[in-house]
UniProtKB/Swiss-Prot annotation:
Keyword tags: Calvin cycle, Carbon dioxide fixation, Chloroplast, Disulfide bond, Lyase, Magnesium, Metal-binding, Monooxygenase, Oxidoreductase, Photorespiration, Photosynthesis, Plastid
Residue positions binding Mg(2+): 167, 169-170
Its EC number(s): 4.1.1.39
Leader sequence segment: none
PANTHER family referenced in this protein's UniProt entry, alphabetically: RIBULOSE BISPHOSPHATE CARBOXYLASE, RIBULOSE BISPHOSPHATE CARBOXYLASE LARGE CHAIN
PROSITE patterns: RUBISCO_LARGE
Species for this entry: Apocynum cannabinum (Hemp dogbane)
Post-translational modification: The disulfide bond which can form in the large chain dimeric partners within the hexadecamer appears to be associated with oxidative stress and protein turnover.
Gene name of the record: rbcL
Protein name listed in UniProt: Ribulose bisphosphate carboxylase large chain
Length: 441
């Protein structure tokens, strides 16, 4: 069975058992009345069952309802169908004040019907020939308004300075100021030029998201013909069907696939209603993507440390034990489905590097947009500062130093022999984003 954990807030006077049973019925075989065609099938075989209810500690009138769905209710290899069944209709139910899907357990038999990520972590490292450290990225800013030529120039400067990747912002598609084909050409030129200068393999996440699947394919095919290593997709606004199609294309044609989660906070930000990001992350691993944005813990965007690390492990690891302290409601066995690199992005800079290296470990992409392009000396020195800070943190960690305790000291030491890093340290020494996380257990 597929198991689901729902956070249920019933209307006043509705017992939790009734609310849990209503959720199970409405998201499987039930409807609002008895119908004569019920007799033509075996409802016992196909109906969802609410098998356990827990009160949520510290919350009045909130319960965790555990529901089991028989596998026969779902089309093989279709995230679209799985989510349509489980969360498609039930969230508008009048008997509920609010409803949130906290977690899913996907059984191995169903996992095996999915291709998953086009390549996965190990294959990506082999393609890039980069091992033993997190990868570095940068979102090109301003996100909108640059011409293709100036955009390509910014890409070149960042890659030349030492970054592994640069990135289209999620809303860069094909607007009047920069059509997609021009952007692809200038970015490809920047990639090959920086590769020739540095001797390292470089990439730029070319956003293939488009208004139709046919147009999306056209952009992905053009990227492959240019010989670039990676494309990008906005998987929630683009849709799971389009994403799975693109992931299959990427595996067949040797392209890596970077996933942006634009619109996720509309779905997952409210604590008592919607769907937790760990469900979106599991759905993405099944649908297919080699990178996905997963919060930073320390930057400008939402994310509590233990919860963030819980779903980061769900993205990367092969087997994850149930651990309610990290928000993991079920043990998940991915039966060798390739892993996804977590991308930390949003309001981070060189002073965050020790914390990011410690929190996310090697299998991650650390993306500094303003933290690269905001350097007072320009884009390339900004990239140099980030690369030096990262290499210093990785070396210190490998020598056995505690990044959580000695992080600032490690950055200060490195800045003595890197003027670019010293300048970056001076610019961002006072920047803080001290807000409490909304998403707590």
């Amino acid at each position: 069975d597929i198991l689901a954990a729902f956070r249920v807030t019933p209307q006043p006077g509705v017992p939790p058992e009734e609310a849990g049973a209503a959720v199970a019925a409405e998201s499987s075989t039930g409807t609002w009345t008895t119908v004569w065609t019920d007799g033509l099938t075996s409802l016992d075989r196909y109906k969802g069952r609410c098998y356990h209810i827990d009160a949520v500690p510290g919350e009045e009138d909130q319960f965790i309802a555990y529901v089991a769905y028989p596998l026969d209710l779902f089309e093989e290899g279709s995230v679209t169908n799985m989510l349509t069944s489980i969360v498609g209709n039930v969230f508008g139910f009048k008997a509920l004040r609010a409803l949130r899907l906290e977690d899913l357990r996907i059984p191995p038999a169903y996992v095996k019907t999915f291709q998953g990520p086009p390549h996965g972590i190990q294959v990506e490292r082999d393609k890039l020939n980069k091992y033993g450290r997190p990868l570095l990225g940068c979102t090109i800013k301003p996100k909108l308004g640059l011409s293709a030529k100036n955009y390509g120039r910014a890409v070149y400067e960042c890659l030349r300075g030492g970054l592994d990747f640069t990135k289209d912002d999620e809303n860069v598609n094909s607007q009047p100021f920069m059509r997609w084909r021009d952007r692809f050409l200038f970015c490809a030129e920047a990639i090959f030029k920086s590769q020739a200068e540095t001797g390292e393999i470089k990439g730029h996440y070319l956003n293939a998201t488009a208004g139709t699947c046919e147009e999306m394919y056209k952009r992905a095919i053009f990227a492959r013909e240019l010989g670039v290593p990676i494309v990008m997709h906005d998987y929630l606004t683009g849709g799971f069907t389009a994403n799975t199609s693109l992931a299959h294309y990427c595996r067949d044609n040797g392209l890596l696939l970077h996933i942006h989660x634009a619109m996720h906070a509309v779905i997952d930000r409210q604590k008592n209603h919607g769907m937790h990001f760990r469900v979106l992350a599991k759905a993405l691993r099944m649908s297919g993507g080699d990178h996905i944005h997963a919060g930073t813990v320390v930057g400008k965007l939402e994310g509590e440390r233990d919860i963030t690390l819980g779903f980061v492990d769900l993205l990367r690891d092969d087997f994850i034990e149930k651990d309610r302290s990290r928000g993991i409601y079920f043990t998940q066995d991915w039966v060798s489905l390739p892993g996804v690199l977590x991308v930390a992005s949003g309001g981070i800079h060189v002073w965050h590097m020790p914390a990011l290296t410690e929190i996310f470990g090697d299998d991650s992409v650390l993306q500094f947009g303003g933290g690269t392009l905001g350097h007072p000396w320009g884009n390339a020195p900004g990239a140099v500062a980030n690369r030096v800070a990262l290499e210093a943190c990785v070396q210190a960690r490998n020598e056995g130093r505690d990044l959580a305790v000695e992080g600032n000291e490690i950055i200060r030491e490195a800045s003595k022999w890197s003027p670019e890093l010293a300048a970056a340290c001076e610019v961002w020494k006072e920047i803080r984003f001290n807000f409490k996380a909304v998403d707590t257990l």
